[in-house]
């Protein structure tokens, strides 16, 4: 398969002819769990204010995208049913989700994909746009995802 590593910050790419806005970063709710076991944790896992401003500038300049890829999702799409019950949401830094909500507002896009919550789910919208949450066990066919209709489900777009 063709694998392309994205830059560590907001950027614009073209994948298979689709103008794509990449917005990495998320807060790790399991940070202390990971650190206590000697597992990897990245201190710069969330975008800095400077990187967020870069994303805002890209949005202002480009305004229209076929696809948006982010690690987490805009705040209005947070799957509350997937929140870990033993972690108080009051302790979770929501800056990235709030930032992505700000970016989504007024942004013209057809599809948005993210993976932070480790589940597979489609969020169909009345305006024809789709929000897709994926975990690393699923591979989506980009062409099928970009051309799906209101009658297609997750199984219809898997590679």
State what each model feature region is.
Residues 10, 55-59, 96-104:
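Short amphipathic alpha-helical segments and helix-helix/interface helices
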Residues 11-16, 91, 101-106, 117-159:
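Binuclear metal-dependent phosphoesterase catalytic core
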Residues 8, 25, 137:
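Active-site donor-binding loop signature of nucleotide-sugar glycosyltransferases
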Residues 1-4, 61-65, 102-111:
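A structural motif corresponding to the C-terminal end of an alpha-helix
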């Amino acid at each position: 398969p063709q694998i392309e590593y994205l830059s560590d910050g907001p950027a614009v790419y073209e994948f298979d002819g689709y103008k794509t806005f990449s917005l990495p970063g998320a807060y790790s709710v399991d940070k202390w769990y990971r650190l206590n076991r000697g597992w990897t944790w990245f201190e710069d896992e969330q975008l800095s204010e400077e990187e967020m401003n870069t994303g805002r500038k890209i949005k202002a300049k480009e305004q229209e995208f076929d696809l948006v890829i982010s690690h987490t999702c805009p705040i209005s799409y947070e799957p509350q049913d997937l929140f870990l019950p033993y972690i108080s949401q009051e302790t979770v830094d929501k800056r990235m989700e709030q930032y992505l909500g700000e970016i989504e507002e007024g942004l013209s896009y057809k599809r948005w994909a993210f993976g932070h919550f480790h589940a597979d789910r489609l969020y169909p919208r009345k305006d024809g746009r789709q929000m897709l949450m994926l975990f690393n066990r699923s591979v989506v066919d980009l062409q099928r995802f970009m051309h799906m209709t209101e009658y297609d489900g997750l199984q219809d777009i898997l590679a």
